[in-house]
């Protein structure tokens, strides 16, 4: 519930410890009951405040913020990332990650903590990716990474590549409008990487599937949010093209459900950011069951890539806007191409039909440009429709 009391940051009862949080604490209710029984007073309905009081409880026992964070985090279940400060240790921030994205940006006389790279573009090119169960003690001049046993961890510093255009609106009113207009070029790039000519075989880049695709008896596509909509689109096409059962699972359901994934299942995980906790967990679970794995992501430097060798990069570029535009288009194009690739390998589509579909696909960037050229008409319709509270699509 959006209220002032529920808003971050959250404070300990004495106001000396402060915390911000991204994620979900699954066992917060039982911890809250324990803390309330010990006299801690809660002012919000959030799971975040439970973490504040839990770490404060441990700090009062130990007198060390680092030790208190480690002891507190070990009692939490879920997917979360925290930043914590204490008035007694004012020169540092402790950041900790468990199943939620967190990076450290390294600057000169300054360091940054963020959940994703776009937040620090323009500030630094040097970053450290924290792994699950790691914390960083961040000071102005230094960053020290440790595990939850308090042991130092040596982390590689990665240099991120980006164009200055990424953080510029390039004359557009806002990033979403800019990213909508980037879609034709994103489609061209996708097609150039996977289908250079209508008579060429489709390529999936460095990804390698079992050469005997006949061993694939079913396909399961795992995703969340917008990516889940892209997956449902793929299911409609693939079942017709491949003559195989294709299931689409919300990653949050897949990880808790008893499913029949095995070595004859092709499991495809889709995550724009590559940091979607449930999708990463689902991909890991499918890997343990021996499934063939493939991941589609827009972020080749992300966590999901580290748990799967087969990656089809979307190459849509960093998406600053919250609303998915060009990344969703890239997902649709990549899934269409991947479906045609599998159909080629299985010979499940007539050759002439396949060639015609390829030719039509190569026309898509120009057709998208044609649609976007009617921006004045689109704006006129948008102004008319924006007052409606709901839409029914048939």
Q: Which residues make up each language-model segment?
A:
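Short, flexible loop segments at the rims of nucleotide/cofactor-binding pockets, characterized by
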Residues: 198-200, 245-247, 269-273, 368-373
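Structural beta-sheet core signal
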Residues: 19, 84, 95, 221, ...
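Short gly/ser/thr-rich secondary-structure transition/capping motifs
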Residues: 199-205, 247-253, 293-295, 373-376
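Short, well-ordered alpha-helix to beta-strand connector turns
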Residues: 14, 124, 216, 264, ...
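Acidic catalytic cores of enzymes that act on phosphate-bearing nucleotides/polynucleotides
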Residues: 386-394
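Glycine-rich phosphate-binding loops that contact phosphosugars or nucleotide phosphates
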Residues: 211-363
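Conserved short alpha-helical segments that host acidic/polar catalytic motifs at enzyme active sites
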Residues: 1-174, 185-217, 351, 369-372, ...
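Predominantly extracellular/luminal regions of secreted and cell-surface proteins
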Residues: 177, 181-182
């Amino acid at each position: 519930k959006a209220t002032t009391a529920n808003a971050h940051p959250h404070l300990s009862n004495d106001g000396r410890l402060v915390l911000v949080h991204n994620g979900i604490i699954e066992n917060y209710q039982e911890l809250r009951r324990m803390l309330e029984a010990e006299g801690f007073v809660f002012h919000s309905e959030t799971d975040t405040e439970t973490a504040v009081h839990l770490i404060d409880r441990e700090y009062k026992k130990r007198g060390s913020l680092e030790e208190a964070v480690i002891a507190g985090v070990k009692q939490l279940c879920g997917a979360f990332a925290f930043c914590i400060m204490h008035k007694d240790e004012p020169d540092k921030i402790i950041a900790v990650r468990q199943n939620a994205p967190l990076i450290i940006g390294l600057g000169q006389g300054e360091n940054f903590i963020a959940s994703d790279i776009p937040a620090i573009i323009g500030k630094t090119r040097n970053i450290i990716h924290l792994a699950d169960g790691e914390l960083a003690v961040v000071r102005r001049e230094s960053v020290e990474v440790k595990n939850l046993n308090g042991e130092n961890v040596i982390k590689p510093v990665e240099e991120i590549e980006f164009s200055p255009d990424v953080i510029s609106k390039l004359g557009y009113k806002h990033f979403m409008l800019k990213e909508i207009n980037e879609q034709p070029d994103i489609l061209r790039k996708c097609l150039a990487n996977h289908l250079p000519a209508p008579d060429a075989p489709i390529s999936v880049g460095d990804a390698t599937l079992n050469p005997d695709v006949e061993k694939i008896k079913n396909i399961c596509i795992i995703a969340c949010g917008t990516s889940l909509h892209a997956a449902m689109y793929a299911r409609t096409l693939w079942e017709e093209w491949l003559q195989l059962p294709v299931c689409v699972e919300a990653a949050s359901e897949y990880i808790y459900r008893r499913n029949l994934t095995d070595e004859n299942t092709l499991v495809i995980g889709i995550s724009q950011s590559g940091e979607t906790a449930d999708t990463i967990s689902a991909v890991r679970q499918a890997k343990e069951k021996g499934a063939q794995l493939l991941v589609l992501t827009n972020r080749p430097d992300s966590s999901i890539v580290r748990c799967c060798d087969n990656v089809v990069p979307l190459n849509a570029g960093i998406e600053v806007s919250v609303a998915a535009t060009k990344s969703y288009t890239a997902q649709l194009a990549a899934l269409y191409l991947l479906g045609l690739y599998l159909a080629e390998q299985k010979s499940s589509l007539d050759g002439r039909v396949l060639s015609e579909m390829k030719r039509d696909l190569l026309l898509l960037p120009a057709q998208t440009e044609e649609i976007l050229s009617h921006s004045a008409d689109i704006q006129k319709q948008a102004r008319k429709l924006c007052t409606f509270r709901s839409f029914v699509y048939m």
